[in-house]
Structures are given as C-alpha cells and as structure tokens.
A protein has these predicted regions:
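Long, low-complexity, intrinsically disordered segments
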Residues: 273-282
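Intrinsically disordered, low-complexity regions enriched in acidic/Ser/Thr/Pro/Gln residues
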Residues: 1-165, 169-172
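A short acidic/small-residue loop/turn micro-motif
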Residues: 50, 177-178
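Feature captures the catalytic cores and cofactor-binding loops of soluble hydro-lyases/lyases
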Residues: 178-268, 277
C-alpha cells in the first residue's frame, strides 16, 4: 500500500531582473523527506517531491536494505511532517551496523551509500550480450532534448531517463540530486517489474562511482551521460563490464568503456577546419 503524495515540482517567485523590472521566475521545489523504516530513522533526503514513494523504494533497493519488493508492506508519505514511513514484513537485518557504515558521496544533495555496497559490487558482472548502436544513442539524445523538463523552466535539477533498446522512453525523472532521480527510476522499475539488462540509462549528471554502482545494482549494462566521469566511476564500470558513454551532446560523445556492445552504424564526416587568410605583408 502506497500513498500518491507528489508535490508540485516548481513554485513561482517574484523577483527583479537586471533592469529593475518585476518578473515572475519559476523555481524548482526542494523539500526534506525523512525516511523511517519500521519506526527507525534511516536518513533525510532533499527532494523535488515529484515521486516520493518511488524515490524511497528505489533508495531501499539500491542500498540493498530490502532484497524483495514483497518484503515492503507499505510506504506512506506525509508532507505535513516531511516524513516517509516504510513498514516491512519482517524488519531489516543488521540495520544498526549498516547505518554506522554510511559513506557520503559526491552527489548533489549529499548522497550516501552503505559501506557493504562496495563489497557487493565485486560480485556483479554484467552479461556481455546485446548491442547499443550509435543511431540509438542519437535517437535517445533527441528524445531527451525535446522532452518537456523542469530544467528548461527553472534549472537547478538533474534528470535521469530509462530507455528501451529501440530508444523508446520508459521513465524520465528530475530531482535536485541525480542520485535521487536514479533511485526514483529504480523504484518505478521495481514496482513495474522492469528488468534492466537490456535497457539504456541516461543521466544529465556526471558518472561518479555512486552512479555506476547504482546502475550496476539495477543490472543496467549501458550508461550514458552528457557530462564527464570520475576515475572511480570508470574503474567500477570496467570491473562490472558496463558500457559507459560520456560527453554525449548533440552528435558528439566519448565511449569511455565498452566490452563490445557499442556499434558504430552512423557515418560521420569530419568538420573541415575554417580557412584562414595569409597574414598581410608589412
């Protein structure tokens, strides 16, 4: 049983522009949401509030606090007290010990991962099967570019999207932190029974170790960002066998890691350098 407690993603703020004129500016929302599991406080998330139940569920999944969705009895979000109450079927094992080994990440909004996730990642090897075509990369980039987003209205948010192998858009989520957006998509996938092995995950944020770990936990083998990456993000992608593509803007991109899935199927013509005139003689 879950509530449907989405909050408005933006608010209107009256301000003055560079000419001193009064204007109305759209601003991204941001709200604290404290997560309680079986009446135990786990953490407080700073979130846009657009998909709070999916966010909480995805967080529990990606942190391996809950192994099966059947173990979750209910998620109740109450914005009057800024709290999400999760009830599980049989409680969480070793919660105190796990809470004591949280690692603060580089994600916007101060994300955290539990220390044992770094050990769990050693057991993950993504299957090498499947293709990710250059034409598919371009198609999903176009879908993102034309998608109506909070970022276009207000800025100040990150976006994540999950695509089918044919570049069909399955989910698109924005939040004040990219780790929130990926957790919300993880929650939606879990609720809908969507498997990740043949999907493509897109993010506007940089490819940090946290992003790669979460994608690997979701069994996603192809991760794309319009931004760059960190050394540890690349290291983990190599370890688990993930296709990693960064700096994907318009028709430019960098294949940062690929165990053989990526297929170049679009001919590209190098742009000729502009002609330069010879310097005038003196």
């Amino acid at each position: 049983m879950m509530t449907a407690a989405a909050r408005p993603s933006t608010v209107d703020v009256v301000c003055r522009d560079e000419s001193g004129e009064t204007v109305v500016q759209v601003v991204a929302g941001e709200h604290p949401l404290t997560v309680y599991v079986d009446r135990r406080e786990v953490l407080t998330l700073m979130t846009l509030g657009a998909a709070p139940e999916a966010l909480v569920l995805g967080y529990l999944r990606n942190q391996r606090l809950v192994e099966r969705i059947e173990d979750v009895v209910s998620i109740q979000v109450d914005w009057d007290v800024h709290a999400a109450s999760v009830v599980t079927r049989s409680g969480l094992v070793d919660l105190d010990e796990r809470l004591a080994h949280r690692t603060k990440t580089t994600g916007c909004g101060s994300g955290t991962v539990f220390g044992d996730l770094m050990a769990d990642i050693d057991a993950i090897r993504l299957p090498p099967e499947g293709e990710f075509r250059q034409s598919t990369l371009y198609a999903l980039g176009e879908r993102v570019r034309h998608h109506e987003t909070i970022y276009k209205q207000a800025g100040a948010v990150h976006g994540c999207a999950l695509f089918a192998p044919d570049a069909g858009l399955l989910y698109f989520v924005e939040d004040v932190g990219r780790h929130n957006a990926v957790d919300a998509i993880a929650g939606m996938m879990w609720l809908d029974g969507v498997e990740g092995h043949d999907k493509i995950f897109y993010t506007t944020g940089r490819l940090t170790s946290e992003m790669v770990i979460k994608a690997a936990q979701m069994r996603i083998s192809c991760l794309v960002s319009r931004s760059g990456l960190t050394q540890m993000g690349l290291q983990i992608a190599r370890q688990v066998g993930m296709t990693l593509i960064g700096r994907a803007v318009n028709r430019r991109f960098l294949v940062l890691n690929d165990p053989g899935r990526f297929v170049y199927d679009v001919s590209t013509t190098p742009t000729a350098a502009p002609a330069t005139s010879a310097p005038e003689g003196r």
